[in-house]
Regions:
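Inter-helical turn/loop segments and adjacent helix faces that build the functional surface
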Residues: 4-14
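Extended polysaccharide-engagement surfaces of secreted carbohydrate-active enzymes
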Residues: 12-288, 301
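Beta-strand-rich recognition/accessory modules
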Residues: 286-338
Length: 338
């Protein structure tokens, strides 16, 4: 769009990058990286810095006729990107030719720096809620097995819920509703069985039978609701289910490998691909200078899923809180030091 503007001088084209660049800041994490877990591209889940956006922010602030709040916002963002490159010891973005072409960009003096610190934005079409507060940022996602991500100054953790019945393996939110101080995520899934054939099939090979011709018996429906409330020091997460009894559920907190877990009973440095059921109390999570606390934990069963299609946390460590439905549990994830 910037190139189209340069060719036509039609200012309407600049409204698109202005909106897009502002939106991008709502995807920046507290450590300055970009949240990519909902990406549909090859960068999904990777740690990506916004270096390639430097010249776009600088261009829009100096040549794009952006005025007022967005102009200052874009200048601060451009400066923050360069400062971050210097702090990390990385190369500056490859845009010298643009500075040579556009005098305003080359002569611009960058003073203030930083991205938007606090925001709350529901991207309803994408099923994404992004919230940044003083001590942490979090992302709630519809349609993903990892439905909640929390970032504390670069320390990323996420939540999943294991539900192993019929074709269901995980809680996947079908509805995401923003509330005054958080959000609600809800999903329903049927327990079902095949009815007997009304007409004898043409084969005795199960895999060759047209199962779509069989009726289903649906005796129960499991409804799972996750309610998230924000606090200054972290999140309050309530898990509530109804409609099915004695189903083993697993609330899973996935943390980076190398995180130290500790409480009054144990001290453990985590390894990738491993996990633990914590049956009671709170547990501290320490990674570098950052410390979080999680709990109260619970462990009513040891079933961790043994069916095909079960996801594994091969790159991190998993804390399991296990309960039998119906479930009505509340846990807290708190920032103790960031």
């Amino acid at each position: 769009m910037i190139n189209l503007y340069e060719m036509t001088k039609n200012k309407e084209y600049l409204s698109y990058p202005e909106r897009n660049l502002h939106m991008m800041e709502l995807y920046f994490e507290p450590d300055g990286t970009i949240f990519t877990q909902n990406s549909t591209r090859q960068d999904r889940g990777k740690k990506v810095w916004p270096d390639l956006y430097f010249h776009q922010y600088l261009y829009m602030a100096t040549r794009g006729n952006v005025t007022g709040e967005h102009r200052d916002e874009f200048l601060r963002a451009a400066h923050q990107i360069i400062r971050s490159c210097i702090a990390r010891g990385d190369d500056a973005p490859d845009c010298l030719y643009l500075l040579m072409l556009y005098e305003q960009m080359a002569e611009c003096t960058l003073e203030g720096s930083g991205f938007i610190k606090k925001y709350r934005k529901l991207f309803s079409d994408s099923g994404v809620l992004r919230v940044a507060r003083e001590n942490y940022a979090y992302t709630a996602l519809k349609g993903k097995t990892a439905f909640l991500y929390v970032n504390v100054n670069g320390m990323d953790v996420c939540f999943k819920i294991g539900e192993s019945f019929c074709e269901v393996r995980n809680f996947v939110a079908q509805q995401l509703i923003q509330t005054e101080d958080g959000c609600e995520l809800t999903a329903s899934a049927n327990v079902w069985y095949y009815e007997p054939w009304e007409e004898k099939p043409n084969t005795s090979d199960w895999w060759q039978m047209d199962q779509k011709k069989r009726s289903l018996k649906i005796p129960r429906t499991l409804t799972t609701k996750v309610t998230i409330h924000e606090h200054e020091d972290g999140l309050e997460i309530t898990l509530h289910t109804e409609g099915l009894e004695k189903l083993p559920l697993r609330l899973q907190l996935c943390v980076p490998a190398g995180t130290v877990l500790r409480n009054d009973a144990f001290w453990l440095k985590t390894e990738a691909g491993q996990g633990m059921i914590v049956r009671r109390g709170d547990v501290e999570l320490a990674l570098g200078e950052k410390i979080l606390s999680f709990g109260p934990c619970f462990g009513e069963h040891e079933f961790q899923g043994h069916y095909s299609g079960e996801e594994t946390n091969a790159g991190g460590y998993t804390i399991f809180c296990n309960a039998l439905t119906p479930v009505d549990k509340t846990v807290f994830l708190r920032v103790k030091r960031k």
